[in-house]
Amino acid sequence: MAEEQDLSEVELSPVGSEEPRCLSPSSAPSLGPDGGGGGSGLRASPGPGELGKVKKEQQDGEADDDKFPVCIREAVSQVLSGYDWTLVPMPVRVNGASKSKPHVKRPMNAFMVWAQAARRKLADQYPHLHNAELSKTLGKLWRLLNESDKRPFIEEAERLRMQHKKDHPDYKYQPRRRKNGKAAQGEAECPGGETDQGGAAAIQAHYKSAHLDHRHPEEGSPMSDGNPEHPSGQSHGPPTPPTTPKTELQSGKADPKRDGRSLGEGGKPHIDFGNVDIGEISHEVMSNMETFDVTELDQYLPPNGHPGHVGSYSAAGYGLSSALAVASGHSAWISKPPGVALPTVSPPAVDAKAQVKTETTGPQGPPHYTDQPSTSQIAYTSLSLPHYGSAFPSISRPQFDYSDHQPSGPYYGHAGQASGLYSAFSYMGPSQRPLYTAISDPSPSGPQSHSPTHWEQPVYTTLSRP
């Protein structure tokens, strides 16, 4: 048993006990020839990790020679006692500027002199004493010492300080700066997290500001570049009926600076509808539509098909029409950009132009407005929900002369379905739905919508050119 203990002691010392000074020449010869040196200076307090290292090294050694003979241990102690361990280079700390120079320790103060000497002695006597408990006890004992007891340690510390000053004349104490890694990391993670979470919110905010909030009169419609921005795959089916828009309200509120900047630079926000769920867009639009007053909305919706209120169209009604049409999953009516605007032409040429326009820009199904000789500058894509065309007639420029060649009513051909006129607002809450269904009166709207006398020139001349 004693031989096993000494084996662990000798093995432990080169592996690296905390204090290499315990291998000094004065302490090494105390190992007796019989291997049972009780007061051996090589004994340190082995922690559980160090014991594991020792056992692993024993297993890695020769399997048949479990115990080293006495002559081997004596040779090891003789070699270790003759070696000056101060010549071993210290590990270089990767500390910025001090990569080339080895780290120089501070000279020990009086307490460190006492603690090191007492730790060595106590570790010899009580090898299983835990290092932390040992440190606590040494600190308590040092505070209980009087001045006469502390004097030898103070003198030794002073001697060490003078020696240190001679050895390192240009020594300067440079404590390692404590890196605030966690705080900096937390600050660095915050913006990244915002952008990750705000990705979908930014898209929805671009959409919202494009259609409802940020309408400049000099800008064209964001959908006025002549090609529908919906992929045709999404335009086929009916829209996804949204649930109660609670979370979309918060996620849609991105910072207005971002929206204003993108609209100011680009002029037209580019929305990748391939990545946006139609259901989310419907939530967003319908949750923002609650800000519209019902009475304000009624002045944009002609209740009996009479277009007398067309002159009072504003930016809100314009944005509302395109937002409603997009929310239903279908392309809204698309007005041509200002550069393509043609002067008023004779009815045959206009008829040919309108036929080409309506059939080419409507890939989703059969065009609804194939008999429009009057759409000189306005092309309709196919609308599966035809009440949008009747609810929001597309007035974008005042120079269209509709009184010259106006047929009996292609625009209000669907206005007879006044009950379908308000089905767009079925996305609203049930508390708001009766406000719209009460207005629908299908009896007067049918005959009035087909009379050509309602298309009068002053309605369009009162509009200012955008």
From Swiss-Prot:
The source's superkingdom equals Eukaryota
Annotated region (Transactivation domain (TAM)) at 228-310
Name of this chain's protein: Transcription factor SOX-10
Q: Which biological process annotations from GO are given for this protein?
A: cell development; cell differentiation; cell maturation; cellular response to progesterone stimulus; cellular response to xenobiotic stimulus; central nervous system myelination; developmental growth; digestive tract morphogenesis
Comp. bias intervals (Polar residues): 440-466
> What does the organism's lineage look like at the top?
Eukaryota, Metazoa, Chordata, Craniata, Vertebrata
Summarize tissue expression: Predominant expression in glial cells of the nervous system.
Where are the residues of the annotated region Transactivation domain (TAC)? 353-466
Bias class Basic and acidic residues marks the residues at 160-173, 254-271
Q: Which gene encodes it?
A: Sox10
Where is the sequence biased in composition, kind Low complexity? 23-32
SUPFAM superfamilies according to UniProt: HMG-box
Q: Which InterPro entries match?
A: HMG_box_dom, HMG_box_dom_sf, Sox_N, SOX_TF
Cite the entry's keywords alphabetically.
Answer: Activator, Cytoplasm, DNA-binding, Membrane, Mitochondrion, Mitochondrion outer membrane, Nucleus, Phosphoprotein, Transcription, Transcription regulation
